[in-house]
Amino acid sequence: MTRPAPTRRRFLAAAGLTAAGTTLGAAALTACAATDQGAKSNSTQTPAAAAPAGGGGPAVEPPVTTGAQALQRLAEGNARFVSDQAGHADEGTERRVAVSQAQHPFATVLGCVDSRVPIELVFDRGLGDLVVVRSAGEVLDRSVTGSLEFGVAELGTPLLLVLGHQRCGAVDATIKALDAKHPEADGDIDYLVEALRPAVQQVAGRSGDRLTNAIHANVDLVLAQLRKSTVIGPLEKSGKLELAGAYYELDTGKVVIS
């Protein structure tokens, strides 16, 4: 007997989600929630940041309901990080208890696996604030894209940020592999090289630092791919979701929004 293919509804049920009355793009449900959250629209959801913080930051922050507000909150957190004023908010016992039954993050961030770019620290955020997905060079596959779709559609974040970074090793390795005329790499690393090849080729002959140019080009290409998603694209067109690219400077700690 052939087992039925897994559907989106089955996945949500298996994850412990309560989907009654919920529509795609309006869901603010969490896979960890034990209580029924009901249907919430993007414009009315109460983000995680509104729960009491358990660290050095403000006890209560105003709700985030738009991509612009989410970007502003990330920018403020990064400014604290750069100036060594990080409050390490949303990390203590009070916060942990507050988010134990439900999560309402305000941004979904795709970043690289580089150990020098810990996304929550870079933006001075804590428990329940961000949906973070990481892959080498921000390379997309079905798992990565599906995770991002989950963040924006089911958890209802109004912002999807793609974060590249200075001296990305994955992009640098791709450049070296292509220059050596034998781009094949060991194991599934070859998959990364092939995925990053278009960004490297796109900047061939361009003035400036080749690696930096390719990193920026890769962020743009990833954003273009995400806009083709049948989940992400319509959310952006409807105004419920904002997509943005950014570049993290290893030397300064600063995040520059594209």
Residue positions per predicted region:
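Active-site cofactor/substrate anionic-group-binding motifs, chiefly glycine-
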Residues: 113-138, 143
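Divalent-metal-activated hydrolytic enzyme cores
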Residues: 12-13, 33-104, 128, 137-146, ...
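Gly/Ser/Thr-rich loops at beta-strand to alpha-helix junctions
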Residues: 115-116, 166-170
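Short beta-strand segments
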Residues: 110-112, 134, 161-165, 244-249
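Short glycine-/acidic-enriched loop or helix-start segments at secondary-structure transitions
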Residues: 119-120, 171-173
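N-terminal secretory signal peptides and thylakoid transit peptides that target proteins
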Residues: 1-23, 27
